[in-house]
Amino acid sequence: MFTKKIKMKIIQKLKTYFSFYNNCTIQRFENYMIAKSLQDLKQRSKVWINRVQMDNSNIHMIYVLLDGVGDLPHPDLDGKTPLEAANTPTLDKIASNGTIGEVISVGKGIAPESDIAVFNMLGYKFDHADYAGRGVIEAIGVGIDFKDGDLALRGNYSTLDENEVITDRRAGRQIEKEDADGIAKELEEKIQFSIPDTKIVVAPTIGHRVTVRIRAPTKKLSSRITNTDPAYSNIGGMGVAKAVGDFLKVEKCLPLEDVENAKITSNLVNEFSEQSIKIMKNSDINKKRKEQNKKQLSCILLRDAGNKYPDVPPINEKHEMKFSCIVDMPVELGISEVLKMKAFEAGGLTDYEEKAKVAAKAMETHNAIYVHLKGPDEFGHDGDAIGKMKNIEEIDQRFFKTLVENIDSSNVAIIISADHSTPCINKGHSDDPVPVVVSADYIKNDGTTRMTEEQAKKGSIGLLQGAEVVTKSLELIRSQIKPNH
């Protein structure tokens, strides 16, 4: 064992190498100094030095993901993208006060869903077999009782025509809570499964979104099944958007493995789909909606099955920071719960000023906050390039303007990116790169002046993978922030 006197001598020696040394690292180092031999000391010191070099305790950053903001040139915008066409004076100021690059959130050739994309953008990269599935993440996010062996799926209320062709995969998107809850209750009460005592929870969340949990008490259900939603493939638990046509039907759920529990699970999902279409068709709620000239809630398209709770390290441990978040949607709420992030209340989806003020205030108690703004993605899915441009302008005026008015940019860094692109011309997610900006008074500008897809290609950050963004941003900040800032 080393005496305290020897420890302090070593600390003083090492201190000369690290200008950003602080009391936090002294305590951390003391933990590594319980060495029993010189060899043990060398090994422990290497670990400690790596941690000192990654010390983020003096960094404050606000990390904003603009859902689906990336896009492609569009004829309605004279061949520009919504980011390029938008009037964004505050975003321009932020970009001019930093450096820019581009990001492929999950991987080349993968048009990701938001869940896996956000995990990657927060630094978590999964092998396909290790991912729990969006269904589980959303079940956690909405507070459904879930345990390993249950089956959780993400669902969409959708509209079918008389030939059961999908005419609107979101049933008009805006669905009254009374109608969504009423249909869900009918399904829970009326669906009868072939396996006795199998129970179902149907939980409507926001708009057209639904989370479904199936529990068969005598069976462990499998996540190795296909989606009934024809717009997405299940690739190792990860939802990947497919290129699809206009005449789509609810797909039959199939086992992805020739094993009993996958076959049993797919049968249960098909029983749910087939019975729910009949129940919903005859529902008094849909009769009322027809009289009101509203879109029918004809079926629930299911995707992204999961059967186990995710096993990942907390984000504070991963990045050596005290993280918090502002999120609205069930999937992001689930991610915050899984990663042990404190979630701040900050109004509704479009309460942009409130979100900005809460994010700025969070810098008093946390040194990082992740803010997820949903708006741009929905316009991308609707193919509305002008609407997407206007939404970006609204976010610039209401969120980013309020944010910069409430933070000290000499002390707080702003990182802005997206979870994926949602090109209006495709009406779906794509693997196209999205911009990333790292901005603060102490960050050297690389000559870029706007956060756009084209300028991102010229920025000094280069091309990153999504799982690298937080780490690379922190490296950039540490390399340029003043000691003891």
Residue ranges of predicted features:
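Flexible, polar/acidic helix-loop-strand segments at domain edges
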Residues: 1
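Enriched - but not universal
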Residues: 30-31, 51
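Nucleic-acid 5′ end/cap handling module spanning
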Residues: 34
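Feature captures the catalytic ectodomains and active-site-proximal regions of enzymes
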Residues: 10, 18, 37-485
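Polybasic, lysine-rich low-complexity intrinsically disordered segments
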Residues: 5-16, 31
